[in-house]
Structure formats: structure tokens, C-alpha cells
Amino acid sequence: MKLTCVLIISVLFLTASQLITAVYSRDKQQYRAARLRDEMRNLKGARDCGEQGQGCYTRPCCPGLECRGGGTGGGVCQQ
């Protein structure tokens, strides 16, 4: 009888702690995903246009910049 009570209380305690942990980590994962998404957007290789001083041989320059010096190696984005 005592062993059964201890077992039931242990199972209830473990279940409650798992539920609390799952709810807590679900909120953390949501913020983590948003942070990773923002970091991916800020990577230089992930941008669709070349910034000032970057090459414009394979991709266009960002707005306000022009591709200049288009020799054999391609141009450079400049104002």
C-alpha cells in the first residue's frame, strides 16, 4: 500500500515536471526561431543585392549604387 502511494506520487510529480518543462521550452523555441531567422537575413551571402565595395558580376547592386569598372573580373558597386 505504501509502495503504491509512493509510486503514484512519483508518477504525478514526474508528469507535472515534464508538462512545465514542455510549456517553458515551447516559448523559448519560438523566440529562438525568430532570432535565427533574423540572423539568416543579416548574413552577407544571403542578400539579394551587392553593397558598396562588393562585386556586381553575379548579382545587381543595392538601390542607390551603380556597377562601375566592369573589366574582366566584373565591376564593383559604388555610389
UniProtKB/Swiss-Prot annotation:
Positions of the propeptide removed during maturation: 23-47
Pfam families per record: Conotoxin (PF02950)
Tissue: Expressed by the venom duct.
Highest taxon listed in the record's lineage: Eukaryota
Entry-annotated residues carrying 4-hydroxyproline: 60, 63
Keywords, sorted A to Z: Disulfide bond, Hydroxylation, Ion channel impairing toxin, Knottin, Secreted, Signal, Toxin
Location of the protein in the cell: Secreted
Signal peptide range: 1-22
Coiled coil: none
Record carries keyword Secreted: yes
Disulphide-bonded residues: 49-62, 56-67, 61-77
GO molecular function term, any single one: ion channel inhibitor activity
Transmembrane region(s): none
Gene Ontology CC entries for this record: extracellular region
Family: Belongs to the conotoxin O1 superfamily.
Role noted for this protein: Ion channel inhibitor that inhibits the increase in intracellular calcium upon depolarization in DRG neurons. In vivo, both intraperitoneal and intracranial injections into mice induce hyperactivity.
Domain notes: The presence of a 'disulfide through disulfide knot' structurally defines this protein as a knottin. The cysteine framework is VI/VII (C-C-CC-C-C).
Name of the protein described by the UniProt record: Conotoxin Tr6.2
Source organism of this protein record: Conus terebra (Sea snail)
